[in-house]
Regions:
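Short cytosolic helices in intracellular loops of multi-pass membrane proteins
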Residues: 183-202, 281-322, 381-388, 397-407
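Juxtamembrane "helix exit" motif at the C-terminal ends of alpha-helical transmembrane segments
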Residues: 22-39, 74-79, 106-130, 165-166, ...
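An intracellular "coupling" helix at the cytosolic face of ABC transporter transmembrane type-1 domains
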Residues: 215, 289-299, 303-351, 393-396, ...
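Juxtamembrane/interface segments at transmembrane-helix termini
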Residues: 30-39, 78-89, 110-115, 171-186, ...
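Hydrophobic alpha-helical transmembrane segments of ABC transporter permease domains
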Residues: 145-157, 161, 213-263, 348, ...
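Transmembrane-helix motif of ABC transporter permease domains
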Residues: 10-19, 54-75, 83-106, 128-181, ...
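Helix-loop-helix
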Residues: 242-270, 333-401
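Primarily ABC-family ATPase nucleotide-binding module
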Residues: 42, 48, 210, 310, ...
Length: 424
């Protein structure tokens, strides 16, 4: 799966993690010194509203730093372990990381836009709203109406500019990822078909090379991008949520704690991930077994097309009974998994509002800041809840991975897993 596309996968991914850690440490520890050396001014911390968010000195320095680090890493691997797919696997992966991070920064730019826009909405409504139903509506001067209208239209135009950029980045990223994943599938297909004599005796070998590599590619296309997006969202929005925590002084039941929004999102997400991992622990094995009983039933039918002695009704009845039994077990396990998952997700919809009740009641934040907090908390929580949101897909990927692992074992002349050993 990985050897066909990545050079020396085990060492490669270890080096990716280690190199990323070193580069991140240098960036967060010495970016001001690096920026000063290159002539960039990183002293301004005020958020820029609009497309200028992506052209600040901080961003320009990041672009230079990222591509320099990526180029150095790729150059070393091109020299150390030349691989036919290295341009796609190394530089392609780096491009996906960058485009995903840029897409997340588009969300940050929109979140920065929320404060002035919704604060302006709040001010406009406050200017004209009567204090009680008995009072007449307050007449707002025409000059004020014109001024606020122009400001709102200006902010809407800024939002449209950011939105068009978001659409462009999304389309480019998805287009590239589709090609990236198909190249990966091509590499797997070439690798497995070249070893056909060694894997042909594994149950459902043809299905595994055709269907399972296809399913692996399809799942990785969605799951891979989502996990990268989750990690990049954390990098982008954790500082935002950390900064917004200064507007929230205390939490219900807990009281005053440092950085309450950050702590609450972390605890709530870990709880949800742990809950779903526990209730869904049996699902990968059941999905894998489901593929096996379906393959056995299909294989007998295929044999019956050429051999009148095969695919007899009693045999087919027994094989389909296995299919039915496994599906019913799968349905039962998914039932209580979905109960736990939906309970958690419904509670998640109002969790942040519960946290903010003391702050809202005290009038400690404006409507614009509230919108920023809701967005940042949602982004961070959803990233921490990656397993919660993707568990069903992860289960499907694990079942495909188990099936393709049989090919890896056969190619390496290792004993097959007991579940895959066929009587000869």
């Amino acid at each position: 799966m990985f050897k066909s596309f990545f050079p020396n996968p085990r060492l490669f991914f270890i080096s990716v993690v280690a190199y990323a850690a070193v580069c991140s440490f240098i960036w967060y520890g010495f970016n001001e010194q690096i920026g000063g050396f290159l002539g960039f001014d990183l002293s301004s911390s005020a958020p820029v509203i609009g497309l200028g968010h992506f052209l600040t000195d901080s961003f320009l320095l990041f672009y230079i730093y990222y591509f320099a680090c990526t180029g150095l890493f790729a150059l070393v691997w091109f020299r150390v372990a030349n691989h036919p797919w290295q341009w796609w696997s190394i530089l392609g992966s780096a491009f996906i990381l960058f485009s995903t991070y840029f897409s997340v920064q588009v969300s940050v730019a929109i979140n920065n836009w929320r404060r002035p826009f919704f604060d302006l909405v709040q001010d406009a409504l406050k200017n004209s709203a009567p204090q009680s139903s008995a009072e007449a509506k307050i007449e707002v001067p025409a000059e004020t109406v014109t001024s606020i209208s122009n400001q709102l239209f200006d902010l809407i135009i800024i939002f449209a500019e950011i939105a068009f950029l978001a659409i462009f980045v999304y389309v480019v990223t998805r287009f590239f990822v589709s090609h990236f994943i198909f190249r990966w599938r091509t590499a797997m297909n070439d690798y497995y078909t070249a070893q056909w004599e060694q894997v042909r005796n594994i149950e459902g070998a043809s299905q595994r090379i055709q269907e399972d590599t296809m399913r692996f590619a399809e799942i990785m296309e969605g799951l891979g991008v989502s996990i990268v997006d989750a990690v990049m969202t954390l990098f982008a929005f954790l500082p935002v949520l950390w900064a917004l925590s200064e507007y929230v002084s205390e939490l219900p039941l807990v009281g005053v704690i440092a950085h309450p929004l950050f702590v609450a999102s972390l605890v709530w997400s870990v709880f949800g991930t742990g809950l779903l991992a526990i209730v869904g622990i049996k699902l990968p094995g059941l999905e894998f077994k489901n593929q096996r009983v379906e393959a056995a039933f299909r294989k007998e039918l295929v044999y019956g097309e050429d051999d009148v002695e095969r695919a007899q009704p009693p045999t087919l009845k027994e094989l389909f009974a296995n299919v039915r039994k496994n599906y019913f077990r799968l349905y039962f396990n998914y039932m209580y998994f979905n109960v736990a998952r939906m309970l958690y997700l419904q509670a998640d919809n109002i969790f942040v509002y519960i946290l903010l009740i003391p702050t809202i009641a005290a009038g400690a934040i404006t409507f614009g800041i509230l919108q920023q907090i809701l967005t940042a908390f949602s982004q961070v929580s959803n990233s921490f809840q990656y397993l919660v949101n993707s568990w069903t897909t992860i289960v499907q990927l694990l079942s495909v991975y188990k099936r393709l692992s049989s090919f890896e074992a056969a190619i390496k002349h290792e004993p097959l897993p007991a579940i895959d050993q066929l009587a000869t």
